[in-house]
Regions:
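Short, structured secondary-structure elements
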Residues: 1-163
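Short Fe-S-cluster ligation motifs
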Residues: 156-176
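Short flanking/linker segments adjacent to small metal-binding domains or redox-active Cys/His motifs
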Residues: 177-181
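Conserved small/polar residues in nucleotide/adenosyl-binding loops
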Residues: 183-188
């Protein structure tokens, strides 16, 4: 009887929702931009949330779970959603006019990503190493900036969430609508 209850709970779609919520806290998931812009919606953030829930519900092995979140955009079509791990947290911005302000915003965003990565995947805090070595922390300032260098050389970009086939169908339909609209406008 106990085994049946466990199986029923593990097979429930609520399993992924429940355990995914813990991971989404680690990933600092938000439907908003975070930081001072939290009221500004973060489009498509829900897609990452749903990916996490589905990963738990489909019992995705942990090594793949991690690999997809770190390098899903390099693993082929269908895996890029997982890289939302790096996109759903705070993104700091400047007013765009002051180069120093822009550099500070980029540095804060980078620091947040390094700290989140180290907490999630290394189970270590790295924030102190941004400024100095600490005698009790295994991550040195050199280690911190080595990790930061990887993220600094990575670009955040918007990528299509639809497959190439879906985009082609959309383009074809849009062309048909445009042709009908143009014909209708010419007739009047």
């Amino acid at each position: 009887a106990f085994a049946r209850v466990i199986d029923r709970l593990l097979e429930s779609p609520h399993y992924g929702e429940r355990w995914g919520r813990h991971w989404l806290d680690v990933a600092r998931y938000s439907d908003g931009m975070g930081a001072s812009q939290d009221s500004k919606p973060l489009p498509n953030a829900w897609r990452y949330r749903d990916w996490v829930v589905n990963a738990f519900n489909s019992d995705l092995p942990y090594d793949q779970f991690v690999k997809h979140q770190i390098a899903g955009d390099l693993l082929g079509e269908g895996h890029a959603l997982a890289t939302g791990f790096f996109a759903v947290g705070p993104t700091y911005t400047s007013d765009g006019g002051d180069p120093e302000s822009k550099a500070q915003a980029e540095a804060e965003t980078l620091a947040d990503r390094v700290d989140t990565f180290s907490r999630a995947f290394l189970a270590l805090t790295a924030a102190c190493a941004r400024c100095h070595d600490h005698k009790f922390d295994p991550i040195t300032a050199a280690d911190y900036y080595a990790i930061a260098g990887i993220f600094r050389n990575s670009k955040t970009r918007d990528i299509p969430v639809a497959s190439e086939a879906e985009r082609n169908v959309f383009t074809t339909i849009q062309a048909g609508i445009k042709a009908v609209s143009y014909t209708h406008l010419r007739a009047h």
